[in-house]
Amino acid sequence: MQLQFLGTLASSEKRKKSQRLFFKNIKSTKNKAGKASIMSSDTNVNKSASPTATAEEQPVEPDGPLPGSDNNQEKKVRLSPAKMSTKNSTDLVEYVDKSHAFLPIIPNTQRGQLEDRLNNQARTIAFLLEQAFRIKEDISACLQGTHGFRKEESLARKLLESHIQTITSIVKKLSQNIEILEDQIRARDQAATGTNFAVHEINIKHLQGVGDLRGRVARCDSSIVKLSGDIHLFRQEHRQIEKAIQEFVPALETLSKNLDMKVMQLLGKIETASSEQTSNLKMVQGDYRHEMNLLEFKFHSLSSNLYEEVENNKKWTENQFLKYRKDHLGHINECLKVLQEKLEKSENKMEEKLLQLSSKVENFINTQKQETQLSKVKHMENKLSKKMEQMEKQIWGELETMQNEYQSGFKSIHDSLSSLQQIQKTKMDLEKYKVQKDLKKLQRKIVELQEV
């Protein structure tokens, strides 16, 4: 049994030496200062075990007095399987957080964390190795002191088995952690190579982009020069158009003033003609009254009716002229000339017809007798009424034609003026639209240049 135990201890020592050689390069100067704190934490963890563990920590009393000194007994009491349980020994090992993924470029904080983890693992390994050597020494002392007793052998076997299990589990976990760290280091190296390659490609693209931007800047400069020349030409054209408009405005004002003067003159002529016409009508009526005293009773009604109708026509014509004057003061030049000519012709015709009638009446009065005068007067009254009706119809027709001609002439003048105004407005709108388009294009190109 002792040979088997010593063989297991030798194999464990070989493993420990190989692990020590592997981790000697990783240890730093901080490990020595942290050993005391780790050992104290381990003892505190072992002390904070369950009540069952404290009960098991009590030494097992042998059947008889054991050989050896009191120091050997103290060592036996110190070496109990509960104190060397696998739970408390494995609690010292720190596991790597597998959920944390490595980034392509590891910052300084992550490197510090990796170094801290490696340092902590090295500390735990050193502490566990020291604890294993102590256990080996305690077991050898226990075997020397408890030679020949079965209970102590069984306790030693249990103790060895438990410690061998803890050591194997710790070694397995440490190997797993080492493999994980190696994988992480490889991933970090691959990410670093990838980032270097990406940076090289980005530099190449950046140089290409700078060359393209220089070409674009040169093109933009040439386009800006062209646009500045176009803007200068547009400004000159705009100034010329403004000058033409300013020259055209006073001409229009003079034309409107001339039209107003002509309209006023025509209105004065129309008023004088109407006053002359009324005076002539009054003279004709007075002559008829003096000459036709005999036919006063029968002809009075007709003359009064004619007088009233003529006055109504006169008022109606005056009202019509006033309305047209208020509505269309600036656009009746040609129509008023035609109206004046027709009025003069109608006045001449009326005067001739009145003279003819007066001569005929005088002839009838002189030639016929008083008996035949009544019949002739009746006949003449009928003829006069018919002729007056014809004259009224002719006057009304001429007035309607004059009104239609006046309205058509005014409409043509109004349409021509409105068409001129629309043409001017459309020209101004087109010029404004062109200038706004050019300004928008310039603003867009300036914004693009600023973005570049």
From Swiss-Prot:
It comes from the Eukaryota. One of its GO terms (cellular component) is nucleus. Keywords: Coiled coil. InterPro entries: FAM81. Residues 1-11, 38-55 have a biased composition (Polar residues). Residues 164-192, 329-452 form a coiled coil. Disulfide bonds: none annotated. Residues 1-85 are annotated as: Disordered. Belongs to the FAM81 family. This is Protein FAM81B. It comes from Homo sapiens. The lineage of its organism: Eukaryota, Metazoa, Chordata, Craniata, Vertebrata.
